[in-house]
Amino acid sequence: MRTTIARRIAACVVVVAAACVAAAATTAAAGVPPGADASIPSGAGYIWDSVAIGGGGFVTAIVPSRSEPGIAYARTDVGGAYRWSAKEGRWTPLLDWVGEDQTGLLGIDGLAIDPDNAAHVWLLAGIAYLNDGRSAILRSTDYGKTFEVIDVTAQFKTHGNGFGRQGGERLAVDPGAGKRLYLGSRRDGLFESGDGGKTWQRNTALPVTATPNDVGLSIVLPDPASVKGGRAQRLFVGVSRYGSVGPNLYRSDDAGATFAPVAGAPAGLMPQRAAFDGAGKLYITYANGAGPHPDKAGLEPVDRGQVWQYDIAGDSWRNVTPVGWTRPFAGVSVDPRNPRRLVVSTINTFIAQGDARGDRIFVSHDAGANWVDVIARGFKRDAAGVPWLEGHAIHWAGSVEFDPLDPRAAWVTSGNGVFRTADIDATPATWTFTVKGLEETVPLGLVSMPGAPLVSAIGDYDGFVHDDPARPGRIHRPEIGTTTGLDAAARRPGSMVRVGDAMLVTRDGGLTWTRTAALQGKRGQVAMASDGATLVHSPQGASVLYRSTDEGASWTRVAGLEGSRLRAVADPVNPKVFYAYDDKALMASLDGGASFQARASLPPGGSRLIRAYPGREGDLWVALRDGGLVRSRDGGASFAPVAGVRYCGAVGFGKAAPGKREPTVYIWGSVGGVRGVYRSLDTGRSWQRINDDAHQYGGPGDGHFIVGDMNRFGVVYMSTAGRGIVYGRPATP
């Protein structure tokens, strides 16, 4: 198991209310110990942690402390924020306290730390498509152990999973005053705070509020060399638009009272990130698009870029792009001990990098006159015990940073995690996959069968066979990328099916997988009959389902079941029986999935992931969200509510308790008005909450699952919106 921090952080129930001076931004303290270490005993006697995969998602930026050695913060697009401790050699997740009504706060669009105090950290949080776009400033004075939540939705919204999310930083602390902050919004212009982020006021001097790509003001950079009277007098603001559309760099020399466009910037490019050298120069990376990848309309291809040096006093520009390179550039950092030593990274560039293809990193020792391609010079990757990294590169390298207090070392972010080198000037430089404690995958499926290891399906990186949840598992091979559907045959051990852009079947528990010869549509969901002989596939975006009885060699259309996002679920006993929930009724098939008929009416809005009681035919449980939890004992002909469950987002089963015959039931739901993870040892007659407010993870996310371990009593797994697969186990076995 991962090292458990022998420290129980007392619950902190603090409610703070404050009215904003400029607008109705509401403030409330997170009523738990947010940022507490992931694997600590919860109030219910459970230890919660992440199933170890190792990274797996886009880390959009890293911000090392300039005042305290060994401390850095990282932000991600859907998995929250993390704090690195060199002393502990791991990352600590900071936002596991986020509830289901705050899931969007796991998308971090900006991060700032006080340059003089690493304990003071601010996050700009929100995702446009979650929680009605709720956006907030999260403010901490204790390294992210607790946060104050300042709701800013009424003033501006952000999108931590939007285009340009690796740019920035759009949130900055004034180097002359730790309580003054600046924020470049995506649609509503420039904002300032004079009270540490509690209240925000719009700065109307900047004439830009929004951009055509909805990225807006992507860089806000107060100049430390300009501090006078307790605040920076000079500010630079980068705008995410082509210079041909309008100025994309503005400058203020009077603490933001007035702004003027900076002439001479590249016309056909957009600024990505920027860094001062402390000697009068500003370095900016550019690309033809906000990134990290092209837009669908083709207006921002992200296939070209440059690096420029701006002389602040002389108001002049110099192109310092590595000679011969036209690729898009993103990350940039300057050695704080040597203003002539720079590092930059490309983005959306896929060139040979060891056994894979990815971005390039360049170092200059003469202010950009000459560059060394540190990847081409000699590249060594250390997977640090994460076996699936084989064949995967550093890519989407949106942020690269020298360690300010040990500038031989450098960090670079990637679409699959974070890498660090202890000596970027070494030949070869060894880049270590530094992701212990940082789990940022989107789980989409999970199977636990008696006598077999846990098996997962995730976005981007297929999924894994997990022999031990504390150690990274074996990635499914052949790899197909995002795997949206996974199922197992209840009565044929070792038989499973998974689907993404291809469909594969295994008969040996995932040691080997064989592609089906045919497929009607891609991705979506798939069900496998209890004997493993029949497959029912609901392709993504399709309004019909398909059935195969020859391991995918041929497919026929399923009758009686039409509608998008439907999914079939196999009965665990009878191989001829399948079920589906179509948002108004329970549908059943008695002919091996060839046709479905309506059995019973059900309220709309429930989870399409029906759960069948293990080892019993026709015993169905349906999570109806606000409709609670219902159960059928007659194959879906009738349903009865499970008493006491007012809300249920997911239901699953696990191994029975010692001395019990009935499987343990687990739910993500509300009992007694409190939402959380619950278990029942008596098939739903009584419930015990087994998580606490510090371990909510934003709820079950896109995977919509909660799965009990069929081999270990009391162990339960849950999907998240971007924090990987989390699991709880009794603190006392």
Predicted regions and their residues:
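Low-complexity intrinsically disordered segments
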Residues: 1-2, 23-24
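Bacterial N-terminal signal peptides that target proteins for export
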Residues: 2-13
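Extracellular glycan-interacting surfaces
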Residues: 16, 28-733
